[in-house]
Amino acid sequence: MPIRHCIVHLIDKKPDGSPAVLHARDSELAASDAIENLLADLNDSYNAKQGKAWGLFHGESGAYPFSGWLKQYLDEEKDFATFSRVAIEHLQKLMEESNLSTGGHVLFAHYQQGMTEYLAIALLHHSEGVAVNAELDVTPSRHLDLGQLHLAARVNLSEWKNNQNSKQYISFIKGKNGKKVSDYFRDFIGCQEGVDGPGETRTLLKAFSDFVEKEDLPEESAREKTQTLVDYATTQTKLGEPVTLEELSSLIDEDRPEAFYDHIRNSDYGLSPEIPADKRTLNQFRRFTGRAEGLSISFEAHLLGSKVEYDEEAGTLVIKGLPTQLIDQLKRRKD
């Protein structure tokens, strides 16, 4: 993972309305194994976070100046240290306006992964721990706690520069349960939500369910293809990459690699060729299966409570919205 530029600043602030004190670094961090390891661990932690949002920059303005400074840096009108300095001063101002904000070390990193360039910005905090020193004494030890990553954003610079119609070149961590504590950080980046990750994922899963029903796939085949979809999408979320519909289609059916993709294109699902999958939504798409005495039942977990109702005391399932093929067979049997 080639790191182009990296720098860390410190904003000292407590969530009590006190002033935010900036301790800015003047020069970039020199390349080192420690920096490589830090960024690799940060990427892993960020990719694993659930509940991220995807979007795009607001139009450049006095309220949202970040994208303009970033463009000046990419156009080589500002060096990286200068860009990060004006950005961190803006973040300091927004922190002071947000009484609930807490300071910390702010990392700016411009790096490349594969053929794609990214800018990562993260507010990092320390945790207290212990270590054993060379004399085998147990001593206090402070370390950056990447497991408690609550404020971070990543800009896909390549996508931003090369695809003006994209609405998902920025990802950022959203506040839990609608909390407004992180709003100042989103305003700092100047980001607006452009893609509803959970909604897009639900639409993708709906399209897949429709595809399975339309193809009238055997239970084993449906289960295998469901697992393929979930495994691929989960892997993409871990890598911080979107789900590519054409690639997914080829994995679902190697003999007919375009079948699922054509199903999506020919129906009114409104999905983009690439979508940011939501891990929490994917976890709801597991299948329940059971077989006994000539009876075989298989359904997706997210249908439980809507189309499928389970009565634990009675040991029964109530299924609503039966497949058309099954209804036709039952009618013919009755006749």
From Swiss-Prot:
GO cellular component: bacterial nucleoid; cytoplasm
Family that this chain belongs to: Belongs to the YejK family.
Highest classification ranks of the organism: Bacteria, Pseudomonadati, Pseudomonadota, Gammaproteobacteria, Pseudomonadales
Main localisation: cytoplasm
Pfam family, one: NA37
Tagged with keyword Nucleotidyltransferase: no
Localisation: Cytoplasm, Nucleoid
InterPro entries: Nucleoid_associated_NdpA
Sorted UniProt keywords: Cytoplasm
GO molecular function, one term: single-stranded RNA binding
Organism: Pseudomonas entomophila (strain L48)
Entry keyword Cytoplasm: yes
Name of the protein this chain belongs to: Nucleoid-associated protein PSEEN4449
